[in-house]
Amino acid sequence: MFGVAKRFWIPMVIVIVVAVAAVTVSRLHSVFGSHQHAPDTGNLDPIIAFYPKHVLYEVFGPPGTVASINYLDADAQPHEVVNAAVPWSFTIVTTLTAVVANVVARGDGASLGCRITVNEVIREERIVNAYHAHTSCLVKSA
């Protein structure tokens, strides 16, 4: 009998220590309130978005220039305007927290420029002076 106790006393001590630790942790969890409570969702007011953002796309160049323009709307969906006379502009008004603003233009004139303005602050502007100019403007977080 002492041979069995002599042989298994270490595993028995480990089992007892693990059991005591489990009971202690369980008691501490109940004392300090770490159990989950379901929130009361019945009284929540809807979140109303305000402070609209005004994103203005502009493509400009010499008079008589015709351009093909691609841009992203407020939902990041691409749109294309073919053979648009410059200067060209498009305004997006949104209450989204972030908008990716992107405009790409290819023109047949000697120069072409693009500009993205957010709430009357110019965030991106590029001008290319080349025949059949190609320009793009990107604001990752408007």
From Swiss-Prot:
It is found in: Cell membrane. GO terms for cellular component: extracellular region; plasma membrane. Keywords: Cell membrane, Membrane, Transmembrane, Transmembrane helix. It comes from the Bacteria. The chain crosses the membrane at residues 8-28, 81-101. InterPro entries: MmpS, MmpS_C. It holds the Pfam family Mycobact_memb. Signal peptide: none annotated. It is a multi-pass membrane protein. Belongs to the MmpS family. This is Probable transport accessory protein MmpS1. It comes from Mycobacterium tuberculosis (strain ATCC 25618 / H37Rv). The gene is mmpS1.
